């Protein structure tokens, strides 16, 4: 049976993650309060950030930056801003 959580990002009841995907206290907070749909949205934003800003996940500062962006996106309702990105038109 699927685990249900109240997703803080989407502000609704949603299917919970199957297991903790991120380490530490933040990982526990994500597991307890973020649904699969919101996590999928974050993964897309994360990929764009890594690619557009040429982040190196071996670099501590880049990992800290990405973690801050993740917290802002998932828990504080702040969208990720990616310079130069123009979303596709709705009619395409």
Curated annotation (Swiss-Prot):
Instruction: Kindly give the InterPro entries that the UniProt entry links to this protein.
Output: Fe_traffick_prot_YggX (IPR007457), Fe_traffick_prot_YggX_sf (IPR036766)
Q: What is the recorded name of this protein?
A: Probable Fe(2+)-trafficking protein
**Disulfide feature:** none
Q: What function is annotated for this protein?
A: Could be a mediator in iron transactions between iron acquisition and iron-requiring processes, such as synthesis and/or repair of Fe-S clusters in biosynthetic enzymes.
NCBIfam families on file: PRK05408.1
> What family does the Swiss-Prot or TrEMBL record give for this protein?
Belongs to the Fe(2+)-trafficking protein family.
**GO MF, one example:** iron ion binding
Alphabetical GO biological process terms: cellular response to oxidative stress
**Coiled-coil portions:** none
Q: Which domain of life is it from?
A: Bacteria
Keyword Iron attributed: yes
Any Gene Ontology CC annotation: cytosol
Q: Which Gene3D superfamilies match?
A: Fe(II) trafficking protein YggX
Q: Recite the UniProt keywords alphabetically.
A: Iron
């Amino acid at each position: 049976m699927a685990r249900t959580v109240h997703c803080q990002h989407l502000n609704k009841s949603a299917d919970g993650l199957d297991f903790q995907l991120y380490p530490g206290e933040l990982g526990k907070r994500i597991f307890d309060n973020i649904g699969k749909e919101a996590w999928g949205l974050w993964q897309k934003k994360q990929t764009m950030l890594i690619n557009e800003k040429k982040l190196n996940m071996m670099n501590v500062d880049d990992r800290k930056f990405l973690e801050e962006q993740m917290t802002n996106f998932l828990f504080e309702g702040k969208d990720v801003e990616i310079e130069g990105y123009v979303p596709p038109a709705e009619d395409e």
